[in-house]
Structure formats: structure tokens, C-alpha cells
Amino acid sequence: MATAPDEARFLDLLDGTRELAALPGEAARLGIGPERVGELLEELLACNALDDSAAHRPLLALPPEERARLAPDLAALSLARPGPGAAPAALLARREARVEVRGAGRVGAAVASLLAAAGVGRVRVRDAGRVRPEDASPAGLRPDDAGRLRTDAAKAAVRRAAPWRPDETAAAQGLPDLVVVAPRGLPDPEHGQALVQAGLPHLYAGVVETTGSVGPLVLPGSSPCGRCLSCRRAEEDPSWPLLLAQHCSGRAAPGACDATLAATVASTAALHALIYLDGAAPPSLGGWVDISMVDGSMRRRPLDPHPDCGCCWQPGAQ
């Protein structure tokens, strides 16, 4: 917007050190009336150029190293959520969020690390057994983690990603705001029924041979679930139930899981999780995203509640 020299000097005063009520007096000394002050502020607000400095003050409670580490994330949030005070509020909300990741393979451990790196304060990883060499990935477990308990190795990976996050014990207290189901292999939709019955939002992520999938994001009772997706896949591919059984059989041999595809799935799943935690709807809500290792394509596929599932039936419906 075009401004006169006096108005330009007034804009210089909007540096976060003055309360809103003090601005008319400051503007009067520059020869600018209160009506024009209101017009300027409305124009700035309309183009998302104003922020609320008071909303940033709670961030001062974070360790200086953590504030510096999260500065790029805060800057990105200010572009995605440009309202006054919206970005710091979203970052602080992430700090209080609880996420449980089920699975510490190439996808799951990386999802947990990325969420912690993005400011999620309470990230817990659940998996059984010990780390195998093929579980290692740049964003998750390390090659020298082989032989360690998966939960211990995943906890260390999360701590490396965010050294100044809250104590891990806080992650185990209370129900999670989101569960990410990312086992080593294909997620079994039947295991997700307990999450549906408990009313816990959850997001599926995994790799099957040369295809990675993110979704659906399940909001129990209001969006299609993993069983809906399994029914849909079985309709499209009659061999799907057999493939699912093979991947969920606990076989000892490593399954196909390209490192770059796993990293892409993990980063996409983490992004979808953050979009949900930040209060918006990611593409995996009411659908899922397939990612091809063969040609690098990403395709969102819509998903409706399946009539053979019943997860979205209303009480009393027949």
C-alpha cells in the first residue's frame, strides 16, 4: 500500500514494543489522526501484515536453544497461519500435544523423529523386540542401534531430533491426541479397531513393496477407517487379502522397503499429522495418498465409509 512519509514513520513504530492503545498518541505526534490510524491498521490486518507480540512471550519459557532450533518452524507457521498470534499459539499447542507412534521401523521411527523435530512435545514410540540392521534410516534409527530394544532406540532417536523437548515420561501420561500406525510392514486394519472403539484419532502409514501409503486419518465415528480401506482394496484387487495376510504374518525375512520411499512416506505422514494437530484437515482425512517408488508419483484417492464396516453408522441405524 502507498504511504506518505509520516505514515511510513508510523509504520516503523509497529515493532512489537508498543501496546495498541498507545498508537493513536504516537501517531498524533506525527500529524496522523486516529481515523487514519484505524484505516492503516485495518489495511495491515487485511493483508496479514500484523502480529501480536504478546502471543510470542510464552515462547520465552523455552530453553534458548529450543527457541533457536524452532525459529524456522515458527516462521513457516506464520506463513501458513498468518493471523495475529496464530503461529506462536500453534507452536505452543504442538508443544503440549501427545502423539503415539506404533512401529519403530524405517517409517515409524522417522515419523516420531520428525514430529519431535517439528515441536511436538510428547512423542512416544511403541514396538516390540530388538532393532535389526534393516530398520536403520537417516531420519530414524541408526545402524549402530542394531540389537538394542526398539523402544529404547526409538526414544534415543526422538531425543536426538529434539534435545530440549520435555521429559519422555510426560509422553506416557494421558491419552494421545493422535496415534500413528506405522508398523514394520503393512498395517493390519483389524488392529485399528481397538483405536476406533476407544475413540482415538489415528493415521496409517506404511510401505508395501514399491508403493507407500499415508492414510486414512481416522476420526472415529465421523470418517472412514482402516477396515474401510481394506474392504475397498479387496474390491479393487481380489488378491489383496492374501497380500495383507502375508505382510502381517510376522515373517523373518526383510520385506521390500526402499529407503527413499520410506523417508518420503514418513515425512508425508508427519506433515499430515502436524496439519491435523494444528487444527486443519490433511488430504488423508476421507482418503489416502499412494506414493510410487517406480515413477515418484503421488496420488490422493478418496475413501468413503464402507457399508461392510459400519464404523460410521449412526446409533440406531439398521
Sequence positions of predicted segments:
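Adenine nucleotide-associated cytosolic modules
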Residues: M1-Q318
